[in-house]
């Protein structure tokens, strides 16, 4: 909402503003090109005056997806050409026409576009998920010196009060059907237990398990943030995934629903 940007202006917060394209491929028809040009123009004009606006980012994980995601790699080469046309030409042209001052970045992560090693740690921004998805230990953060880490994170369970809002007593087991439905990352409840077993003794009850998972999340995030802050100059910033939730769920959020 516009109120969000007003608050960021007042509080001195800088907004990394993604355009609404993420984790997908698009067939760039004439009609779609016309539609996105109008959408971008309208929204850039709506937000361009905000002091909090740090940059426009063309998309999330669409450039790097061609290197890492089998479902994207199997797509037609013509869709790859459409990606280049869309995010190297159509989208930046529309943004610059409406806002010539704010920096535009084609994709995240990226080394500058056109599929030029988007995960290069020496250029651009990187997303780092070996801690969590790769189940690497927290110490693995210390092996990486990104120029800017624009996404990393770690999951925890919500508070007991939140869990009670969507479960009955018989469901209060992290592998129950209800608890699994309130977890959208496959096998993630097991990942939390794996990391918990590496760092703590197993909690004696369900309430303590939820709480300890949050302590674990805090430890993971602190480890990464502390490492990259120590190397300021080489790494000039981080963004973590994520701050909050829009429904009661186990997730990467720091703030419970």
Predicted regions and their residues:
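Substrate-binding clefts and catalytic carboxylate motifs of secreted carbohydrate-active enzymes
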Residues: 56, 93-96, 106-257
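Active-site mouth of glycoside hydrolases
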Residues: 1-103, 108-110, 114-115, 238
